[in-house]
Amino acid sequence: MFNDIPVFDYEDIQLIPNKCIISSRSQADTSVKLGNYTFKLPVIPANMQTIIDEEVAETLACEGYFYIMHRFNEEERKPFIKRMHDKGLIASISVGVKDYEYDFVTSLKEDAPEFITIDIAHGHSNSVIEMIQHIKQELPETFVIAGNVGTPEAVRELENAGADATKVGIGPGKVCITKVKTGFGTGGWQLAALRWCSKAARKPIIADGGIRTHGDIAKSIRFGASMVMIGSLFAGHLESPGKLVEVEGQQFKEYYGSASEYQKGEHKNVEGKKILLPVKGRLEDTLTEMQQDLQSSISYAGGKELDSLRHVDYVIVKNSIWNGDSI
């Protein structure tokens, strides 16, 4: 069965244009609804320590973008929820599945966040299912995102447990080495895995990992994603919390994976690595460029909104999209 699945990734696909029906790309609507909220773009900066902190989260929320705060400053999560609610902003946090997280979730009853993401590397597990059920019992109004997974069976099981959305992607990210360390994952066929999982889904799918260009966002939506989580494209900005490093007169920001020894603080069960990225400028400029490029994608799709991307045809051009050019 598995060997019958078409295997391809982002660089192997080109979308086929339809007749344009808008006079300017600025007429294209890139907004997306998740739960009871509408956001400006279908993108989420990865919930990683070198991508997002409280300041970046607040900026994103103020500007109408979705965000997920990482879970690695555990004692700061509850004050963060209060801070966001005091400012009239949505609170979106991450939790793990260890025993103490159950008490933490229960403690949120008086000030429940709008979104909770259960964030572990291998999300198709009883521990995630039990945490979904616990959150839904304690905080029934909270939107639960669960992951990460890579199969239709996992999507169905997490949805049946009560997840409101599932996050698809096992190790396709730029600083993730799961496929090398374990032999498992969706690295190299993330887009095909997304297509496979979305066919089984009844609720939103969040594509997580493997995004290298803005065009990959449109491709993700074409193959079933409601939103797209992105790491490396959001790393390295002036506002990014990664450490600033100077090498031969050029400034770089650190970017490391959520299962790296740099994040974990120990050399144990490491599935991530650290790299240096040239400082890119302001996050706001990248978000604006993403929106403009996605508006262009919608115009090529022959529509006015994101849904038009779901209906375009495509061709598989194995590894030839760059024609030898680097990106």
UniProtKB/Swiss-Prot annotation:
One of its GO terms (biological process) is purine nucleotide metabolic process. One of its GO terms (molecular function) is GMP reductase activity. This is GMP reductase. Coiled coil: none annotated. It catalyses: IMP + NH4(+) + NADP(+) = GMP + NADPH + 2 H(+). SUPFAM superfamilies: Inosine monophosphate dehydrogenase (IMPDH). Pfam families: IMPDH. Keywords: NADP, Oxidoreductase. NADP(+) binds at residues 205-228. It comes from Streptococcus agalactiae serotype V (strain ATCC BAA-611 / 2603 V/R). Catalyzes the irreversible NADPH-dependent deamination of GMP to IMP. It functions in the conversion of nucleobase, nucleoside and nucleotide derivatives of G to A nucleotides, and in maintaining the intracellular balance of A and G nucleotides.
